[in-house]
UniProtKB/Swiss-Prot annotation:
This is Methionyl-tRNA formyltransferase. It catalyses: L-methionyl-tRNA(fMet) + (6R)-10-formyltetrahydrofolate = N-formyl-L-methionyl-tRNA(fMet) + (6S)-5,6,7,8-tetrahydrofolate + H(+). It is an enzyme of class 2 (transferase). Signal peptide: none annotated. (6S)-5,6,7,8-tetrahydrofolate binds at residues 113-116.
Amino acid sequence: MSQSLRIVFAGTPDFAARHLAALLSSEHEIIAVYTQPDRPAGRGKKLTASPVKTLALEHNVPVYQPENFKSDESKQQLAALNADLMVVVAYGLLLPKVVLDTPKLGCINVHGSILPRWRGAAPIQRSIWAGDSETGVTIMQMDVGLDTGDMLKIATLPIEASDTSASMYDKLAELGPQALLECLQEIAQGTAVAVKQDDALANYAHKLSKEEARINWNDEAAHIERCIRAFNPWPMSHFEVAENSIKVWQARVETRAVTQTPGTIIQADKSGIYVATGQDVLVLESLQIPGKKALPVQDILNARADWFSVGSQLS
């Protein structure tokens, strides 16, 4: 059994809460949790606690929610905890050097990609968007740069042809906690090995935007199909037809030469809506029209065949 560490955990969404749950079941002592301040959520815009806060309170772990770490009070508060280590998972706040240096062993971060391939805010989405064959989690020693710290552990898994950001999120939320526990054991035993990142291999995973999710039919069908999976569940790839914005939940690529203008419907039946692109054909299989849930194309055509007639132009 490895030595028990006094750990401060910092995180906010469900992805982080799954890591906290693993720590709470481990031999380590979780002495405090930091999470984002409660935010308005839902139709009523009621102040809502983060998943991490909810879990911490269920286990009677003290919770701190500073807006930032600029005040002396917030820095002194952290120092008074006398932590061995801070574990950071999708916290959402930048940590200044004084915070990184406060725990005896510094701060480590669980990042949702194989570093240095995708640094930044949207590594899961960008790995699918780019057509990567694998992804994973990297646990790194944090420094003042953005995901630039020395790597302590990498765990990988393949990206399947059907994976969306939603499915990869769930897979990494299972992979990450196990890798974290293994890394903590090595840190506690003094056997952890830090490996520097090769900055020449780094890419920045920019945040997604609704504008980016609008389908450009001039792109290759393979790229559009990857975007559809990368932008699921947010912001959802979409196009316009008959002055309606249509979300695309599922599509496939059919390799064949096309002569029609990109965005032109060349076939529409129960097997799919076939759309010309800059290269090959994109076959739409599941769509969501305004005010409705996502449906197979066959059902969409039963209700709105006039929107998707052969020769119609999608924009």
